[in-house]
Amino acid sequence: MAAKIGEIVQVHNDNPVKRVPIARPSFGREGKQIKLLSNHFTVKLSGIDAVFYQYSVSIKSEDDKVIDGKGIGRKVMDKVLQTYSSELAGKEFAYDGEKCLFTVGPLPQNNFEFTVILEETSSRAAGGSLGHGSPNQGDKKRSKCTHLAKKIVVGISYAAKIPLKSVALALQGSESDHAQDALRVLDIVLRQQQAKRGCLLVRQSFFSDDFRNLVDLTGGVSGCRGLHSSFRTTIGGLSLNMDVSTTMIVTPGPVFDFLLTNQNVRDIRDIDWPRAKKMLKNLRVKAIHNNMEFKIIGLSDEPCSRQTFPMKVRNGSSEGETVEITVQEYFKSKQVDLTMPYLPCLDVGKPKRPNYVPIELCHMVSLQRYTKALSSQQRATLVEKSRQKPQERMRVVTDAVKNNRYDDDPILSSCGIKIEKQLTRVDGRVLSAPTLVVGNSEDCIPNRGRWNYNNKRLFEPVKIERWAIVNFSARCDMSRISRDLINCGRTKGIIIERPFTLVDEDSQSRRCTPVVRVESMFEKVKANLPGPPEFLLCVLPERKNCDLYGPWKKKNLHEMGIITQCIVPSVKMNDQYYTNVLLKINAKLGGMNSKLSLEHRHMIPIVNQTPTLILGMDVSHGSPGRADVPSIAAVVGSRCWPLISRYRASVRTQSPKVEMIDSLFKPLDDGKDDGIIRELLLDFYKTSQQRKPKQIIIFRDGVSESQFSQVLNVELNQIIKAYQYMDQGPIPKFTVIIAQKNHHTKLFQENTPDNVPPGTVVDSGIVHPRQYDFYMYAHAGPIGTSRPTHYHVLLDEIGFLPDDVQKLVLSLSYVYQRSTTAISVVAPICYAHLAAAQMGQFMKFEEFAETSSGSGGVPSSSGAVVPELPRLHADVCSSMFFC
């Protein structure tokens, strides 16, 4: 396939037909039957004639200023219901906490205006002051002027009708405009119930401050275990999906304890205060001397003993005079002796009106979400301590449904909604694992999703001749690593010559920046090698996620074109450890560890008969709280058809937090296409005997149901444009499959404590009433409760039978070259995720804000300039560098 020269051709109609997700054609039949339980609870819906009335809510102060402080809305609306129940005809309502209110049936009139007064004076809600006994500018005056001490004007106006009958129609498989809206109202009813109990609400999950739910993650952060609940339309009827959920919160307790653990110091005097200021900003604290809550905006410039503020002192009947007083003196006058006056104060006022309170008098408010990125150690602790065995999870969710007493809710009752208290039973099928082929064309049959290379050779081992080991670790025996790696490779069929050189980092370089350390190491490598190596083994320091990783990968893959494998010294550097390392090295250097038996014998249904390109697509976003970090879009494409085990990656940056990939087709001013798909199409053509793909199977990760239409009508259109620009022949047939891991459906075996066996597929009972979806457990779950991948087939022009789609998905979970286990999602998606993560290390994202206005960037869909990723060197761009 050759790129077309010249102007971009017209590639589609001006008004293309909008694609919609296809309906389920039929059900799968193959596999051994298995009885399962799901964490869905059947919902009986008898009041289908009920109609939800939606009303818009506005909350303003007397002077017409909008009040939108967090938590105010629910308090105000509770007061409205309490005060004006008769005007509202005694109707209960569901309120989303912001601008929408819902009732069953209409209110007496379409528009209301109510006035309420809240007697609470919480600074958290109103942005007020510390109140009596606290140093600030205009102390007494400000204590009387919080928003909540004033009258609040509430406007309620009719917005829309949402018939509950729409849910019944959706359950019958009909398209319904209001079904999702009605389900959202039902979810809001459950959220409101938990809000009244004081729970933290995070989307459709809720969390209480019961200490038994907390897991200390160190650093002042705790994992908080709660519950997720959502109503779902399924082929078996309406259901309530209830699952265990976890979020991160700031560990409640004294602020100085939080600072000590957050910065891992023992003495409060060792605190890095600029860092503390950044961490504390916008967190809420409660002052123990007056029991009021405040939001932190910063720290004082001076410690309590020296930080002054003006205070008006009255003398008899005169106006009095203003004097400067320190925070410490002020509190002493109020009979509060500070024990740590050398600490700065928390500023809980406003930017131009500071309001100081000593740190030692403040405690962190409970249930504050922690939205910053966790460290690798915190993540590991969270995963380890959040695990629940299947039987325990079943008990927790069942108890939750029983204890929440949903049947007593007046709104649910008025809709005729009754929720069963038992887990829903579903039928599943266990598909047979695909047979693999290893060295000497020997068959390897996985057992419960696992296999090994004991006494086996790799299917296509490479030979490594020109290589070296570089050592950034202070404690490492490179000679032993070299010897053990060579010996292990020999047993797996990989011939590894002795390394040309073993290069240690000198002690002086260890004090330099990561980039300088990498450059110095490369100078030493070049001085000790007669030519460029084909492979470098890099020993990193003991610490994971070390700062050297990104610069090292960029130097090798972008500048030098050298395949590299990084390892971290481990206590257990045994044969299994070296085998796992060699699996990655062999795949990166062009070898193949195993392949499917069907692939080896050219017997993969449909894919084998017609040139077929398989794409895996994913977008990785910056860590929480980093809205300035570009997202990274990665697409991998299969190569060397009819193989489905080899892939090449293409990666681009795009606007932060944007999920839709905008660089699949990327026409330039010179008439060329610099998009991702062109790169992968050319590679397929070159490696597949100059064949063009006549079928393209797309696996897309990371999109929600609300984005399905964009995948079908935006991303797919880009792919078609890229193909038509290169070739004006027939457009390939497409099959588009979404893979979702971020859902809350779990399945359990009924009579055993074990997880669901690998190969289990469910396409009945709890699946969509109309759309073409199924749940697949391709992997084994040895610990915790395993989660299935939820696959949605949005388009199938190729014409797979359901059994063929499900077997293809299962097979693609066994071609992941990095491991000897089946993985939970198809390998192309995992590879795309790995490619995005590794290429993301190429750039220092914290510098993006400074560089985005300079050269080398490309305009994003929002108009802002997003810096481009450095491209891979020509010598490695077609490799599986991401393994």
Curated annotation (Swiss-Prot):
Record keywords: Nucleus included? Answer: no
Q: Which SMART domains match?
A: DUF1785, PAZ, Piwi
Q: Which keywords does UniProt give here? A: RNA-mediated gene silencing
What are its GO cellular component terms? cytoplasm; nucleus
Q: Which InterPro entries match?
A: ArgoL1, ArgoL2, Argonaute_Mid_dom, Argonaute_N, PAZ_dom, PAZ_dom_sf, Piwi, Piwi_ago-like
Where would I find the Piwi domain in this sequence? Answer: 535-844
Q: Which GO BP terms sit in this record?
A: regulatory ncRNA-mediated gene silencing
Query: Molecular function (GO) terms listed?
Result: RNA binding; RNA endonuclease activity
Where does the record place the PAZ domain?
254-366
Q: Which family does it belong to?
A: Belongs to the argonaute family. Ago subfamily.
Q: What does this protein do?
A: Probably involved in the RNA silencing pathway. May bind to short RNAs such as microRNAs (miRNAs) or short interfering RNAs (siRNAs), and represses the translation of mRNAs which are complementary to them.
Instruction: Please report the name of this protein according to its UniProt entry.
Output: Protein argonaute 16
